[in-house]
Amino acid sequence: MRTLRKIIKVLVLICLIAGIAACSYLIHEGYDMYKTAVEKEPIAQKVEEIRSRDNYTKIDELPQIYLDAIVSVEDHRFYSHPGVDILAIGRAAINDIKAMSLVEGGSGITQQLCKNLYFTQEKKFTRKIAEVFMSFELEKKYTKDEILELYVNSIYFGNNYYCVKDASLGYFGKLPKDMNDYESTLLAGIPNAPSAYALTKNPDLAHQRQKRVLEKMVKYNYLTQKEAEAIMHN
């Protein structure tokens, strides 16, 4: 029995050492990926590239309910975390470990913006770590509203629409500032899975996603249940 216990202790120790070594390696690789990316093209340069586009929309030209919907469904702790939502990442990490792959990202708005600016959509641990380093830098240089503004101007909405203005014009035939509450909450749900929720492909799925958006808005006190129901029955 004592021999068995010793063997178990040794195996546990080996696993811990191997785990620490693997984590250290991934962190080092992720940091290198982040440094290489920003040295090649600084964040400020990337940001100005987006802001200079003809279809760029400023945050004060967007309906407040649209912004609230985005935050509710994508990153409800956006205004309180430092660029990375540790709780969301921890929950996602547990699910990833169970599945033995990156099945759940846990990325918030800032991390998604970093991915859109620099990285591919391919799910890799090193890329996720690079996003974390870049998110901290982005949050040091820009306000939350500036980050949210950049986010909605760089995310994909399906049907070849890569910003909120193109999506609003393409799906509804109007500028973002003219979207009503129904359109705003409908559009907010699409970027989670644009190929699935694109209104030109799967309108029924998009409306199911909209219900999820409204549920989140009620949960995080952006809307009352009565207001959410009124929007759905618009």
How should each PLM-predicted stretch be described?
Residues 1-234:
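Juxtamembrane regions of bacterial inner-membrane/periplasmic proteins
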